[in-house]
C-alpha cells in the first residue's frame, strides 16, 4: 500500500507550519506538537517508498526566508527521507522570475509548490489551480491574492502560514511610549501589497486613539 497524496500534503503542511514557527522564533512546544502530527501523517511513506518532488520558489536570499526554507526541507526530510526531493529556485527578488520558476514547476509536474514570500505565492497561484501550494513568509493572504471577504481560508489549492504581526498591539505600544506624539512616521514599500496593508491597519488604529 502506498501513502496517499493527501497524507503527504497533510504532512507537508504541518512541516511548513513548524518551519514558519522556527523562522519566526516560535515556541518549542508548538514546534514539537507540529512534529508529532507530521510524524503520524507521514509514518507509512518511508516504508512504502512513494516518491515526491517539491518545488520551492523563494523570492530572495534573506535570513528569515532562508530559515523558513531550510526548516521546511529539514522537517520533510526527517519524515520522508529519500522519498522526497526538492527543486529549490531563488528568484533574485524579481517577480517575473517567480513566474518563470512557477511555470517551470508546473511543466515539471511537481507534487507540491512551496512559495516563500508574497510574489512567489502570487506567481504560483497564477501558474496552477491544481498543484497544491503552500505559502510562507506571507503576511495577509487576502491582500496578497486579491480575495474579497477573506475569512482566513484561501481555499482551492492554496494554503500556508502567515507572519502577520499584532498590529493593534504595536499601535498601542506607540501611544503608550509616546503619549504626547501627534505625528507618527510609517516607513513601508507601496509596491508591496502586504506592506501597504500593514501601514493602513496601523494608521487606522492610531487614528482611533
Where are these regions (language model features)?
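Stable alpha-helical elements in mature extracytoplasmic
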Residues: 64, 68-72, 97-101, 116-120, ...
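Beta-alpha junction/loop-to-helix N-cap segments that form part of ligand/metal-binding clefts
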Residues: 90-149
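N-terminal secretory signal peptides
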Residues: 1-3, 7-23
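Extracytoplasmic "Venus flytrap"
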Residues: 52-73, 79, 87-96, 191-195
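An alpha-beta-alpha
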Residues: 54, 58, 72, 159-206
Amino acid at each position: 500500500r502506498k501513502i496517499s497524496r493527501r497524507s503527504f500534503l497533510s504532512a507537508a503542511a504541518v512541516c511548513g507550519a513548524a518551519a514558519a514557527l522556527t523562522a519566526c522564533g516560535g515556541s518549542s512546544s508548538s514546534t514539537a506538537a507540529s512534529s508529532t502530527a507530521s510524524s503520524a501523517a507521514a509514518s507509512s511513506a518511508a516504508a512504502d517508498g512513494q516518491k515526491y518532488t517539491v518545488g520551492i520558489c523563494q523570492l530572495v536570499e534573506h535570513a528569515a526566508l532562508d530559515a523558513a526554507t531550510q526548516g521546511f526541507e529539514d522537517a520533510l526530510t526527517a519524515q520522508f527521507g529519500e522519498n522526497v526531493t526538492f527543486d529549490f529556485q531563488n528568484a533574485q527578488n524579481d517577480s517575473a522570475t517567480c513566474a518563470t520558476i512557477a511555470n517551470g514547476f508546473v511543466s515539471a509536474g511537481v507534487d507540491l509548490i512551496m512559495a516563500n514570500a508574497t510574489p512567489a505565492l502570487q506567481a504560483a497561484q497564477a501558474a496552477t489551480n491544481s498543484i497544491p501550494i503552500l505559502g510562507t513568509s506571507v503576511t495577509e493572504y487576502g491582500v496578497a491574492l486579491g480575495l474579497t471577504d477573506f475569512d482566513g481560508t484561501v481555499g482551492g489549492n492554496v494554503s500556508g502560514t502567515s507572519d502577520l504581526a499584532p498590529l493593534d498591539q504595536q499601535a498601542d505600544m506607540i501611544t503608550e511610549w509616546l503619549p504626547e506624539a501627534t505625528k507618527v512616521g510609517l516607513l513601508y514599500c507601496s509596491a508591496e501589497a502586504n506592506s501597504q496593508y500593514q501601514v493602513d491597519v496601523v494608521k487606522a488604529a492610531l487614528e482611533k486613539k
